[in-house]
Amino acid sequence: KPDLMQNNTNDENLFETVAKYRMPYILMHNTDKPDLMQNNTNYENLFLDMASYFADKITTLRNLGVKDIILDLGFGFGKTMEQNYELLRRQKEFEVFSLPILTGISRKSMIYKPLDISASQALNGTCFLHAFALENGANILRVHDVKTAKDCIKLYSLYKNNMKK
């Protein structure tokens, strides 16, 4: 049996399968199919729209008996670069759901495009933004470069622990 399920289609049948096998589920915010999502970045209010989306899906999953849900805010999926940065800055607001928040920004275009580099060259920018993600509520980082992410988390933890003294 799989350890974890994620699917950005949010298919009700998939939710039933997740419930049946008592699997953790990563619930990602996404507005559309991959080939159309970047055409659908106009939100009346990004945060209210996302909160409503998550509330609806979480209710459905809970009603089916799914206990382990992780929120993925869907960086890069149906959001402009500006929306992605605002989302990173304000992701702590999604703690209202009392669920772990997964942040997946590693090598995303929001990093490499403004730096005019390739995705494979975006390690420094990724590390820099991972620290902000942790500061702003990320519990889980989805990464490409595991050792570098572990180093970032270790240094961030030292920083946070020294802030408490």
How does the language model describe each region?
Residues 3-63, 78-165:
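Active-site-adjacent loop and "lid" segments of alpha/beta metabolic enzymes
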Residues 74:
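Conserved Motif II region of HX4D acyltransferases
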